[in-house]
Amino acid sequence: MSQLRLLLFRLGPQARKLLATRDIAAFGGRRRSSGPPTTIPRSRGGVSPSYVEEMYFAWLENPQSVHKSWDNFFQRATKEASVGPAQPQPPAVIQESRASVSSCTKTSKLVEDHLAVQSLIRAYQIRGHHVAQLDPLGILDADLDSFVPSDLITTIDKLAFYDLQEADLDKEFRLPTTTFIGGSENTLSLREIIRRLESTYCQHIGLEFMFINDVEQCQWIRQKFETPGVMKFSIEEKRTLLARLVRSMRFEDFLARKWSSEKRFGLEGCEVMIPALKTIIDKSSEMGVENVILGMPHRGRLNVLANVIRKDLEQIFCQFDPKLEAADEGSGDVKYHLGMYHERINRVTNRNITLSLVANPSHLEAVDPVVQGKTKAEQFYRGDAQGRKVMSILVHGDAAFAGQGVVYETFHLSDLPSYTTNGTVHVVVNNQIGFTTDPRMARSSPYPTDVARVVNAPIFHVNADDPEAVIYVCSVAAEWRNTFNKDVVVDLVCYRRRGHNEMDEPMFTQPLMYKQIHKQVPVLKKYADKLIAEGTVTLQEFEEEIAKYDRICEEAYGRSKDKKILHIKHWLDSPWPGFFNVDGEPKSMTYPTTGIPEDTLSHIGNVASSVPLEDFKIHTGLSRILRGRADMTKKRTVDWALAEYMAFGSLLKEGIHVRLSGQDVERGTFSHRHHVLHDQDVDRRTCVPMNHLWPDQAPYTVCNSSLSEYGVLGFELGYAMASPNALVLWEAQFGDFHNTAQCIIDQFISTGQAKWVRHNGIVLLLPHGMEGMGPEHSSARPERFLQMSNDDSDAYPVFTEDFEVSQLYDCNWIVVNCSTPASYFHVLRRQVLLPFRKPLIVFTPKSLLRHPDAKSSFDQMVSGTSFQRMIPEDGPAAQSPERVERLIFCTGKVYYDLVKERSSQGLEKQVAITRLEQISPFPFDLIMREAEKYSGAELVWCQEEHKNMGYYDYISPRFMTLLGHSRPIWYVGREPAAAPATGNKNTHLVSLRKFLDTAFNLKAFEGKTF
C-alpha cells in the first residue's frame, strides 16, 4: 500500500490524466477485462483513488488481468518512481522526462483546480449558513458571530484560498456527484458555480445538514435545495400564502385594537408562522397524515387557535370579557394556555384532518414530552407503527429551546423503540430575544437550535420576512419527516414587534433593536407589494381580502358579547368519546369490586412462572425465581411482584392496554419484576410472558426508559391522555428521584383537571422506605403529594352511601401506601374500573418485596373482594376493644416493624394497630368507626419518616376535625430533620429503636398536653 501511495504521490497527475482518457474504464465501471470496455461510464465525481488502487493490486497479481493501457501506465510509473533524483539518466530519458514533467504540470494544475472546486462546493454546503441573510432586521448574525469562514468566496480575493485566480472564473469545471447545482448540466463555469452556491446557501435560507452521518439523507437535502428552479410557486400558491398572511396579521391587529391593554402574547414580527404551520399540515395531509398534535408556548397561541386549529373566533374573543363566568369547577387557566381539539376538512387536500393543541403551563418546553407521549399513544391505538397517520409539531421559542433541559431529554426519546413518534417537525420562533435577555447572554452555542444536532436532525434556518422561502422550507420539512421518519427543525428568524407582552416596554433593555423594529415594514406589506408588482394580485384584491377578514372578526366580536358563561370543557385537547355522558359527567358513581375469579389468578400465576417460548434458555437465578412463583401459586399466595403480575394480566384479559415505563422497569430496580426474559445463548432475544396469557388479550408494553425523569414522566402523562381504557404507569428508580420531574407533577398531574378539565389516570410508582440507605434512596417525599391534595382538612364530611366514590371523584389525585400485595393488586385494578380517571400516587416498598410476612392469600383477591382503604386491627385487641390502651395508626412498611415489636413486648391485647392504605382522600368514615370502637384508647400516629416529613402534618388536622378536638392524636416517629434520612446505618437503627420504644411505652404521653 505504501508503494502505491508513493507512486500516486509522484505520478498522481498522470494517473488522473489516464483516468480521464476515454480508452480507460472510468470510475464507476468497476469491471476488469482483458480488453477495453465497450461502454465507458462517466462520473462527475472525478478520480477515485480507491479505483486506482483496485487496478494497481490487480496488476500486481496478474498484469494480464487489466487493460493494456493500465499495464503500460503501471510499468512506466513503477520504473520512474524507482528512479531517484541522484541517479544518472540517459539523454533520451531526460528529454522524455522533461516533456512528461511539462505535461504533468498542466495536468496537475487542472486536477488541483477541480479538487479545489469540489472543496469549494463542500465549504458552502457545510458553512454557507454562517453568512446567510437570516435576520430581517439586518442587525444580528444568526450564529452570533460576524466571522466569515475563509473558505467561502464572499470576495474575489478569497479565491486565493483555493489557489484559484480571477482568470479561472470563466473556466468550465466538472461538477461532483455531491451537488445538484448543475441541474441537467455536468459542467459549469466557476463564476456560475459560486453564484448558484451563494443563491442556495447564503441568501434567506441557511442549511445545517452536513453533520448528518447518512449519505442518502444529505443527498436528499442537497437535491431539494440546490436543484435550479425548485423554489418556484404557482399563482394560486402565492395567492393562498398572501391570504394566510392577511389572516395572521389582521387577527393580531384586531386584538390590538379591541383589547389594547390586555396580555395576549401576539405574533407580530413572526406572522409568517401561521402559513408555515398550515403548510406543514397541508403537505403532511397530502402524504396521508390524518391527525396532527401540536404543542407550543404562549407566543402566537391565540392566532394558532384561530387560524390553524380554526377555533370559533367568538369563543376566543369572549375570553377577553372580565365578566365571563366559569361554568366548570376548578381554577381554569388563562386563554393563552388552553388547548383545543378539532376535526375538519383540510381545504388544500380535501381530506379529513384532526388537529389537537395540547394545553400547557407557562413553564416553557414542559409540554414537549407530553405531546410526544400523546402522539405515540394515538399511533399505537391506530396501529400506525410508521407514523404515517399521526404526527406531532412542536413550536418553540429561541431562548427556551436553547435553555430548557427538557428539550434535550425529549430529543433523546425520538429514536427509542418504545418512545419514537417517527419524526417531529420543530418550528422555532426565533425572535432573537428572551423576554429582555440578549441571545449572547442566553446561550453558548452559535444557534438556539444546536441541541437538535445530537439526533442528526437537519436544521433549516430561514428569514421570516421571506414568506416564500419559509413556505418552501416547511414543505421540505414535512417531506423529510415523511421520508425518513426523523425529526427536523425549522428556525424562523424573526423579531418581536412589541414587548414580551403587550404591557411591556422593550426600549428599556433593547433600545437599538427596537429603533430598527419601529422602522421595519411588516412582512404582509412587503409580500403584497411584491405580488402586486409582479401582477399576481391587484391592489383592489388585496384590500378586499383584508376587508373580508376584518368583517369576519367584527361579526365574531358581536356574537362574543352574547357569551356569558365560559365552558373550559369546550377547550379540551383530548376528548374521550363515549366514556362520559353528554354533559361530561361519569355515567355512574358505582364503586367497583376489583376481585377476579380464582382460575384467572391461577392461570396468570402459572404463566408468570414459566417461559412461553421453546428453546429459550433463562438465567439459573431466574429459574429459581420462577420456581418460587410456581410454588406460591400452588399455595394460593402472592408476593408483591406476583400481585402486580396478576393485576396487569387480569386487565389485559379485559381488553385494557397496560404500559409500564421507567428506568430499569423490565427487570425492576430491586430485581423483583422480571417481566422481560433474556435468552442466555442468543443475543438480544427476549420474551415477555405477559403477552402470552390469552390469544385475544390486550397488548402489554414494558420498556426501560432513558435516564430521564422529566422527559419520560411527561411522555407517559401524554400517553395516558389519549385514552381512558389503558393503565399507564411510570416507575421511578427510587422515589427520591421523582423531584427531577417536579414540573410535570406540579403543573400537569396535580392541577391538570382543575385548570383544563382534563381527566388523567396515570400511575406513579415511587419506591419509598427508611432502610438506612441514605438521604437519596429513602423518601418519595409523601408530604409534598399530600400538601398538594385538595381535600379540606377542616370540613367535616357527610357520610352518604356513595361517600367513598364521591371522595375519589372530588379529589385531584389519589395517594396510597399499600402494606399488602392484595392492596396493591386491588388499587391497580380500581384505577381502571372507576367510572372516571384520577392520577394515582403509589408509595411502593423495597424491603417488603421479599419480606416473609408481606404476602397475601388468593382469598383476598378473588371475586367479591375490593380495595380496603384502611385495614383495621384483627388480632386479640380487636376481640376486646374496651381493654385496649393505645390505638396506633400507621401506613406502609412501618406496620411490620410495629407488629414485630408489639409481639416481642407481649402487648397484643393492650395495643391495636390499624393501617391506612389510602391516605388521600382521607378515609374519614373508617377512621371514625375505628376511633369509636376503641373509645377508651390513646390515639397515636406512628411513621418512620421525620416529623416534618411523611404524613403527620396531613393526618393530624383531619383527625382533629373528625374527633372535634376531643382526643389528641400523638406523634411517634423520627425527630424533625433537614435531610429525609441518614446515611449511617447505626444512626438509622438507633432512631428506629427510639421511636419503637416510644410507640409501646404506654406512659409516654402521661402529663403531656396536646
UniProtKB/Swiss-Prot annotation:
Q: State a GO cellular component annotated for this protein.
A: oxoglutarate dehydrogenase complex
Positions binding Ca(2+) in this chain are 130, 143, 145
Positions binding Mg(2+) in this chain are 398, 431, 433
Q: Give the domain of life.
A: Eukaryota
What is the enzyme's class at the highest EC level?
Answer: oxidoreductase
**By its UniProt entry, which SMART domains does this protein fall under?**
Transket_pyr
InterPro entries named among the record's database cross-references: 2-oxogl_dehyd_N (IPR032106), 2oxoglutarate_DH_E1 (IPR011603), DH_E1 (IPR001017), KGD_C_sf (IPR042179), ODO-1/KGD_C (IPR031717), THDP-binding (IPR029061), Transketolase-like_Pyr-bd (IPR005475)
Q: Which reaction does it catalyse?
A: N(6)-[(R)-lipoyl]-L-lysyl-[protein] + 2-oxoglutarate + H(+) = N(6)-[(R)-S(8)-succinyldihydrolipoyl]-L-lysyl-[protein] + CO2
Required cofactors, per record?
A: thiamine diphosphate; Mg(2+)
Q: What is this protein called?
A: 2-oxoglutarate dehydrogenase-like, mitochondrial
Organism, by scientific name, is Rattus norvegicus (Rat)
Q: What is the lineage of its organism?
A: Eukaryota, Metazoa, Chordata, Craniata, Vertebrata
